[in-house]
Amino acid sequence: MAYELPQLPYAYDALEPHIDAKTXEIHHSKHHNTYVTNLNAAVEGTEFADKDINDLIAMLDALPADKQTAVRNNGGGHANHTLFWEVIAPGGSNTPVGEVAKAIDAKFGSFDAFKEEFAKAATTRFGSGWAWLIVDGDSVAVTSTPNQDSPVMEGKTPVLGLDVWEHAYY
């Protein structure tokens, strides 16, 4: 089984005016696709080629040393972007509901306080990377990771990811 570029559940222009159609197309069909292509090349013919992407990046230390960097960068890029495309839905809600809302309120006191913390994680990430809302034990937390690292690599569950690479917003 080769890893595949997921189809977007919306058109490239569906995120306008926040992300223009050309940026969404390049980001998905070029950048994300490159991560998938390079990941497949790295794991082709190995026992790792059939792993779920999140299972694969969670076991980086168990991979052969010569595969770890390629899987970290490209597997992380594929996993991160797959979540990214799922959570930035056009016409989505501006505020969380249900269990996510309760967890945010319990941890941060309010959605506005969460937004401040999340924005801080995104704007203070030196260089390229991601800002995250993660499940950490019985609570949620805000964190950031460099490059294409994923919270999954640290045993955490990402709920929301914001790509802060320069290529995300030409």
Curated annotation (Swiss-Prot):
Q: Which cofactor does it need?
A: Fe cation
Q: Which gene encodes it?
A: sodA
Task: State the UniProt keywords alphabetically.
Answer: Iron, Metal-binding, Oxidoreductase
EC number in record = 1.15.1.1
Name the chemical reaction catalysed here. Answer: 2 superoxide + 2 H(+) = H2O2 + O2
Q: What Gene Ontology molecular function terms does this protein carry? A: metal ion binding; superoxide dismutase activity
Q: What is the lineage of its organism?
A: Bacteria, Pseudomonadati, Pseudomonadota, Gammaproteobacteria, Enterobacterales
Q: What is this protein called?
A: Superoxide dismutase [Fe]
Which enzyme class? oxidoreductase
| Known function | Destroys superoxide anion radicals which are normally produced within the cells and which are toxic to biological systems.
Q: How is the cofactor bound?
A: Binds 1 Fe cation per subunit.
Organism whose genome encodes this protein: Raoultella planticola
